[in-house]
Amino acid sequence: MANLKDIRDRIVSVKNTRKITEAMRLVAAAKVRRAQDQVLRSRPFADRLARVLENIQSRMQFEAADSPLLNKREVKTITLLAVTGDRGLCGGYNANIIKRTEKRYAELKGQGYSPDLVLIGKKAIGYFENRSSLYKIRATFKELEQVPTSEDAASITSEVLAEFLSESTDRVEVIFTKFVSLVSCNPTIQTLLPLDPQGIADSEDEIFRLTTKDSQLIIEKDAAPSNEEPKLPSDIVFEQSPDQLLNALLPLYLQNQLLRALQESAASELASRMTAMNNASDNAKELAKNLTIDYNKARQAAITQEILEVVGGASA
């Protein structure tokens, strides 16, 4: 049986590790709420932009619109935007996106297309740059804000927009993690370009808040209020022509779509990290319990052995 001191040192080490993982869980839980607040704050602009586009759509056919962002040309080159995080300790969050990107890349190559990658996040960059002989990398972005901002989305949008307008690529797809709940985050593929604006339909958000129960911090789930604004009047008059409006609004729409993908990915990363740290804390608690049992058994065996030696010596 292991030495008593070794077991005692392991117990101390496991308990210290549990303190760290528990602290990381609470930090991630608080940041999840911040990420959700960011999504909700950007929602009014997204909703109003969608309504304006819907209003314009009702007055004209997009097929007849003179906007390069809507033109569906023959597809030869497809750019994949892979959104991962800069850090680990978040379960399978980064690995799932990388696997989905590899699968999609192989699918497109097998169908005769010429795919390339735009990588967002250090984890994706590190993985695919180490395999640069297998994957064509167009651009990389790292060290974005933990809660993505419109500036982050704008820098990425300008890159992919320039490539699309110059016909260096014919289609742009973003691979990100859709935030479903704290325990469910799904890798998702969405086409960014060419645009097909049919409104922004969002399912009802879930709000998560820290609270206490039985002297323990827990997380409660609630539904976000849906503050629907009335639709724009159908008789509203625009000074500019529909084509001018589209050319001005569609880049904003594209940036908003990408920002939403970045925000959902950030929330998913934090939720995955919170879940991973919660599991690590539970495992550490169970391991400390088992080690304590082993320590007590070893101590009891040592005491029994000493008693036997004393009794044996007295008998002699």
UniProtKB/Swiss-Prot annotation:
Coiled coil (UniProt feature): none
InterPro entries: ATP_synth_F1_ATPase_gsu, ATP_synth_F1_gsu, ATP_synth_F1_gsu_CS
Membrane topology, as annotated: Peripheral membrane protein
Gene3D superfamilies assigned to the protein according to its UniProt record, in alphabetical order: 3.40.1380.10, ATP synthase, gamma subunit, helix hairpin domain
Listed Pfam families: ATP-synt
SUPFAM superfamilies reported in the protein's UniProt record: ATP synthase (F1-ATPase), gamma subunit
Quaternary structure annotation from Swiss-Prot or TrEMBL: F-type ATPases have 2 components, CF(1) - the catalytic core - and CF(0) - the membrane proton channel. CF(1) has five subunits: alpha(3), beta(3), gamma(1), delta(1), epsilon(1). CF(0) has three main subunits: a, b and c.
Role, per record: Produces ATP from ADP in the presence of a proton gradient across the membrane. The gamma chain is believed to be important in regulating ATPase activity and the flow of protons through the CF(0) complex.
HAMAP family: ATP_synth_gamma_bact (MF_00815)
Protein name: ATP synthase gamma chain
Lineage: Bacteria, Bacillati, Cyanobacteriota, Cyanophyceae, Synechococcales
Gene designation: atpG
